[in-house]
Amino acid sequence: MKSICVFAGSAKGVRESYSKSAKNLGFEIAKREFSMVYGGGSKGLMGIVADAALEGGATVTGVITERLHDVEVGHNNLTSLEIVPSMHDRKARMAELSDAIISLPGGVGTWEEFFEALAWNQLGIYSKPIILFDVDGYYSKLFEFTQFSVEEGFLPESTLAVSYTHLRAHETLRYLVC
């Protein structure tokens, strides 16, 4: 395991625990000498996790579209920032550069990144670990819905084995190195 892709919101959310967990995850990535790949923004949980990883000494690569670079204010202090033409190119590049994906809380963009990675896994395109970092139960309703989808016959049981959930940064990363 060398490089972790982090999906995260461009907002901080209302709970302080979201920011604290993003910061802890960034520090843990650096502490374990992983590099980090993420969406390249400087705001919200994205910016917090990147800043913490950088502060801890990690190499951090941002991948952002030209349009989002202007909207989200691309992070200017990264080890490297790649600007790509489309959202699809952004997700494909982040997946290509990483050995695992961790999804922090976020909105529609974060969900879409997570679900596309999950779909790629189901189709055999992406075979690396995909982890939901379930801060304060943020993803608990999603887990319930996923189980319901399995019960209703729309999702194979094997999909549940692909994504794991952890409640603390050190547990999340310990899982990846075991």
Where are these regions (language model features)?
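Hydrophobic alpha-helical segments, chiefly the membrane-spanning helices
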Residues: 177-178
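Glycine-rich nucleotide phosphate-binding loop and flanking beta-alpha elements
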Residues: 12, 43-44, 108-110, 173
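A cross-family phosphate/adenosyl-ligand binding-site feature
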Residues: 1-97, 136-164
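Active-site-adjacent beta-strand anchor residues
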Residues: 39, 104, 132, 166
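Active-site/ligand-binding-proximal alpha/beta "capping" segment
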Residues: 91-123
